[in-house]
Amino acid sequence: STAEVQLAAQSTIPNRDFVLDFRVAGDTVKSNLMTYEDPQSGQGYFTMMLYPPTGHESFARQPMEMVFVLDCSGSMNGQPLTQAKNAVSVALDHLQEGDTFQIIRFSENSTQLGARPLPATKENIRIARKYLARLHGTGGTQMIEGIKAALDFPHDESRLRFVSFMTDGYIGNELEIIGAVHDRIGAARIFSFGVGSSVNRYLLERMAKEGRGAVAYLGPQDSGEDIMANFFGRISHPALTDLEINWGGMAVSDVYPAKIPDMFVGRAVVVTGKYLGGANDVSVSGYRGADRHEMTVNAADDSNKAQVSRIWARLRIADLADRQAWQQDPHGELENSIRATALEYQLMSDYTSFVAVDTSQQTDGEYGVT
C-alpha cells in the first residue's frame, strides 16, 4: 500500500528537512529496497530501509553488560552531576539476573567501581549506589581516560556490551576522543547522554554514531527515570544485531554507512549505495539473541525516483564528514570530496550552499521597479 504526504499549509516555506513520524504496523520487521538507474550514465543507486515493529514485546530480552561512564569534572558539578547519578541509579533498577555492570568516573583521571563488571545482584547494586553517592565534580575533563577504561577491558561475548557516557562533552580534544572510539570500539555500542542545559552535541553525536549507538539529552527539567526506562526498553530487546547483507549477484559499491548499526525498536536502518548491471533481491541477516535470522528484501524499480541518488549523496557526505572527525584531513582530500559530491547532486554541505538569483527584469522609466 502507498500513501501520499504533503504539507498542510501551502504557504509554508520548505527551508528545512521534512520529518515524518509514523508507526510500523504488525510485530515483524518490514523492509523496502528502492532502486534507480540514471538514464544518461546507466549508474544505478539503491536505498534499502529496514523498519522494526513499534513494540519490543515480540523480541526476547538479551543479557547485557552495562558500563556507565560518568563525567565528574568541574563543569558537571552541581545539578548536571546529580542528574547523571540519579539516571544511573534508575538504570540499575532495570538490570536483571544474568546482566553485569560497571561504573567508571573520570575527570583528570579515571577510577572504577570494580576490577571487572559485576553481576547485577542486590548486594552489588547496593554497593554501586554507595559509590555513586560519594562522587562529586572537580578538576579538568580528560575524557580519553574514560574511553580507555570503558573500552579496553575484555568483552564477555555472551552479553551485549553497552557503554553509556553521561557528560556535557566540554573538552578540548574532540578529534582525539572520536579517534579513540573508532580504534577501540570492538563489539561494544556507545550511547551518549548529554547532561545539562548546554552540551557539546557535535561530540556526543559523533561518539554515538562511531559507536553504533544513539544519543539522548537529559535537560534540567527532564526525568532521568523516563529517559532510562525508554533506553533500556530499546537496548534490552534488539530486533537484530550484527547485521550482514548478502547482495547476491548485485554489483554494489560505495555503500553507506560503512558500519551498519543494530536495529532497535523506534530506529530504522537505512543503507544506500551504487550498483551496475541491474538490481536483484538481497538477503539481510542478523542475530536475535543466540539465533541468527535471515530475511529477503525485494528490489523495486522506481525509475521515476531520481531522489534515490540524492539520498546516496547525502549519506556519502555524512560518511566523509565523520571520517574528517577522527581521521582528520591534512591535505583537504575529504573536503574536496564533500564539495564535489554536494555540487554534483545539488546538496547543502559545510562547503556549499544555495544562492537565490533574482532573474526578474527592471522596467523602463525613471521610477522603474524590479
Tell where the protein language model's regions lie, with residue ranges.
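Short, charged loop segments at secondary-structure junctions
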Residues: 61-79, 86-89, 93-99, 104-170, ...
